[in-house]
A protein has these predicted regions:
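A structural motif corresponding to the C-terminal lobe/cap of the Radical SAM core domain
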Residues: 1-176, 189
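Auxiliary Fe-S-binding modules of radical SAM enzymes
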Residues: 114-257
Length: 257
C-alpha cells in the first residue's frame, strides 16, 4: 500500500498519534494505536519517502501530571517535523461529551479550535492551570529551534536514497523562483533570533543530503512560521495563556491523580 501511495504521488500523511500512554489511548477508544509499535510504524512510512504529520492531545482523565514530558520524548523519537498538539476537546455527539454531561463537567460547546484558545470546554481531572502549563511546556520544548531542526534532520536521515517526488531544485522545473526562495530563507533566517540553529541545520542537511534540497529548504521555511507562531502564543501578553478562565472559577473540584 505504501509503495502504491508513493507511485500515486502521496508525499505526506496526517496520523492521529494522540499519546504514547496506553491507558489514555484506551480511554480515547484509539485501540488501533495499541495494536502496533507506533514508532516503528511511523519510521516505516518515512522510509518510503512519505512525511508524517502527527496530531497529539493532552487532557485525558488518565494523563499523569508529567504528561508533557512523555509527549516531548514521544514526538522527538517519532521525528515528525510538524506536531499538531492540542488540548482535549469534548465534541457534541461523542461518548466523551455525553459522559461529561452526565458527570456535570461540561462547561460549554467547543469552538472547534483546540490548539490556540488555550482553554478547555470541560473540567479536567487535574487542575486546569496545571494542565495548561503542561501544554505550554510541551509547545515550548518541541518548538525550540534546536528540537525542531533535530526532528527535521532525523526525518531526512530516514528517507530512502532516491525519493520519487521530484525535487524542483534539481529537476527541469528549477527556476529563478526557487533561487529566490532559497536566498530569502538564507538571509532572513540566518539573521533571525534562531540563526545559529538554522545554520547548523542547513549545513548538516546539505552535507548529508545534497539530493534533497527542496525538502531541506521547505522544512526551514516551515520552521520559521512554526517557531514564530509558537512564540506568539506563548509570550504575547494578549495570548490566552495569560488570561484567566472566569467561567470556571468556583465550579472546579479536583480529584486526586
Amino acid at each position: 500500500l505504501l509503495d502504491l501511495m508513493v507511485e500515486a504521488g502521496f508525499y505526506m500523511v496526517f496520523l492521529g498519534l494522540e499519546t504514547p500512554l496506553a491507558h489514555s489511548l484506551e480511554e480515547a477508544g484509539k485501540v488501533q494505536n495499541l495494536k502496533t509499535n507506533v514508532v516503528e510504524s511511523v519510521r516505516k512510512i518515512q522510509s518510503r519517502g512519505i512525511e508524517v504529520t502527527g496530531g497529539f492531545i493532552i487532557g485525558f482523565d488518565s494523563d499523569p501530571l508529567d504528561i508533557a514530558d512523555h509527549q516531548i520524548r514521544f514526538i522527538q523519537e517519532l521525528a515528525v517535523p510538524t506536531a499538531m498538539v492540542g488540548l482535549l476537546t469534548a465534541l457534541p455527539g461523542t461518548r466523551l461529551y455525553d459522559r461529561l454531561v452526565r458527570e456535570g463537567r461540561l462547561l460549554n460547546t467547543p469552538s472547534g479550535n483546540n490548539t490556540h484558545d488555550l482553554d478547555m470546554n470541560f473540567i479536567p481531572r487535574q487542575p486546569m492551570e496545571r494542565l495548561i502549563q503542561s501544554y505550554r511546556k510541551l509547545l515550548e520544548q518541541i518548538y525550540k529551534p534546536k528540537a525542531y531542526f533535530r526532528r527535521c534532520l532525523e526525518f531526512l536521515n530516514r528517507l530512502p536514497e532516491k525519493v520519487r517526488h521530484s525535487d524542483t531544485f534539481r529537476s527541469g522545473t528549477f527556476s529563478l523562483r526557487n533561487v529566490a526562495i532559497l536566498l530569502r530563507s538564507f538571509f532572513k533566517q540566518t539573521f533571525s533570533w534562531y540563526g545559529f540553529s538554522y545554520l547548523s541545520y542547513i549545513l548538516r542537511a546539505f552535507i548529508r543530503h545534497p539530493d534533497k534540497i527542496e525538502q531541506i529548504v521547505s522544512f526551514a521555511v516551515q520552521g520559521h512560521h512554526l517557531l514564530k507562531l509558537t512564540r506568539k502564543i506563548l509570550y504575547t501578553d494578549s495570548s490566552p495563556l495569560f488570561q484567566t478562565v472566569p467561567h470556571v472559577q468556583g465550579r472546579i473540584k479536583y480529584d486526586t491523580v
